[in-house]
Design a protein with these regions (language model features):
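Short amphipathic, positively biased membrane-proximal segments
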Residues: 1-318
Length: 318
C-alpha cells in the first residue's frame, strides 16, 4: 500500500524515469522562469557586498523551499498526489539527460574529426574559452562536465529529494541556479555571488561524495579511482568537483585537469588545475565511456536513495 514516505520514493523514481525518457521540457521550463525572476530581483538587491548577496539568496531559495513545503503539505494525506507531485518536481529539477545529449554531440563531432564544431558544441557545457582547444582538450572539457553534472544535476538533487522531499528538490535547484548565475569570480559578482557559491558548495557535499563513491564502485578500475580521489581531489579548486572528477578519471583510466581559461580579452582568467588521474589525455571515444559511467552512477544513486526516501516518518510527539 502506498503511504506518504513510499509516495516520495515512488515519485523520485517516476521523476528520474521522466528525465531519462523525455529530458527537460522543451518550452516553459520552470527553472528558466526562476532565472528570469532572479535576474529581475537582482536589479533591486544588487550591491557590491556579501550581505546583499546573502539577502538575494535567502529570498529566492527561501521562496523555492516555501513553495515546495506548501505543495507537499497540501498533499500530505494523499499518497498518490504526493507521488505525482514529487515526480513532477524531480523531473523539473533533474538535468542529466539533456546534458548527456549535449555531451554525446561533442563526442560524435570529435570522432568525425569536426574539431571546430566540437569546440562550439562543448561551449554549451562549460564556461571556459573553447575557441582554441585541441581534440584532447575538448574531450577533457566534455568529460569534466559529464562528471560534475552527474553530481549536481542528478545525484545531489536526488539526495535532497530523498531526505527532505519537494522542498529539498526546489530549494536545491534554486541554489544551484543562483550559483550558475552569480556564483563566479567576475568583478561584478566576486562579493555579491559569495553566498550563492558557498550555499551551492554546502548542498552538493553529500551528493558529490556519493557520486564519487558510485563512480569508484561502478567504474572499470575501482583501485585507480580510489587512488585518484585520495591523491588528487584535494588540490582541485572546487571541494565537490574535485572528488567527482578524480573518481571519474581513475575509473576511465584518463588524465583530467590542466590549464583552463575562462573569459576572453582583458578579463580572461587562467586556472592551472592539478592533474586528476594517472592515465593518458582523453581521446574522442572516452566521451562515450564517460557518459555510460554517468548513466550507471545516476541509476545507482536512485537505487541507494529510494529506500532512504521510503523510510517511515515517525509522528511528532505532542
Amino acid at each position: 500500500m502506498l503511504n506518504g514516505s513510499r509516495g516520495r520514493a515512488v515519485g523520485l523514481a517516476l521523476g528520474y524515469g521522466l528525465d531519462r525518457a523525455l529530458a527537460d521540457p522543451a518550452r516553459w521550463h520552470p527553472v528558466a522562469g526562476f532565472g528570469t525572476l532572479a535576474a529581475r530581483l537582482e536589479q533591486t538587491t544588487y550591491a557590491d557586498r556579501r550581505s546583499a548577496g546573502v539577502v538575494h539568496v535567502a529570498l529566492l531559495v527561501g521562496a523555492g523551499v516555501a513553495v515546495g513545503a506548501a505543495a507537499e503539505h497540501g498533499a500530505r494525506h494523499r499518497p498518490v498526489a504526493q507521488a505525482l507531485l514529487t515526480a513532477a518536481a524531480t523531473w523539473t529539477v533533474l538535468g542529466g539527460t539533456t546534458l548527456d545529449r549535449e555531451a554525446a554531440a561533442v563526442g560524435r563531432l570529435l570522432e568525425e574529426g569536426r574539431l571546430p564544431e566540437a569546440r562550439t558544441q562543448v561551449a554549451r557545457l562549460v564556461g571556459r574559452d573553447t575557441r582554441t582547444l585541441e581534440v584532447a582538450e575538448v574531450a577533457r572539457a566534455a568529460l569534466e562536465s559529464v562528471a560534475e553534472n552527474t553530481s549536481d544535476a542528478v545525484v545531489a538533487p536526488l539526495v535532497l529529494g530523498a531526505l527532505v522531499g519537494v522542498p529539498g528538490l526546489l530549494g536545491y535547484r534554486a541554489a544551484n541556479t543562483l550559483d550558475a548565475m552569480v556564483g563566479h569570480r567576475s568583478a561584478r559578482y566576486a562579493r555579491f555571488g559569495w553566498a550563492a557559491a558557498r550555499l551551492d558548495d554546502l548542498l552538493n557535499l553529500p551528493g558529490a561524495r556519493l557520486t564519487a563513491a558510485l563512480a569508484t564502485v561502478l567504474g572499470a578500475d575501482p583501485a585507480a579511482s580510489v587512488r585518484a580521489w585520495r591523491r588528487d581531489a584535494g588540490a582541485h579548486p572546487s571541494p565537490n568537483a574535485g572528488p567527482v572528477e578524480a573518481a571519474f578519471a581513475g575509473a576511465l583510466g584518463v588524465r583530467l585537469g590542466g590549464r583552463t581559461v575562462y573569459g576572453t580579452g582583458p578579463e580572461a582568467r587562467v586556472e592551472l588545475r592539478p592533474p586528476l588521474g594517472e592515465g593518458p589525455a582523453p581521446a574522442p571515444h572516452d566521451v562515450a565511456r564517460g557518459r555510460r559511467l554517468a548513466a550507471r552512477v545516476g541509476l545507482g544513486s536512485l537505487i541507494v536513495l529510494a529506500p532512504i526516501a521510503a523510510r517511515p516518518v515517525r509522528p511528532r510527539r505532542r
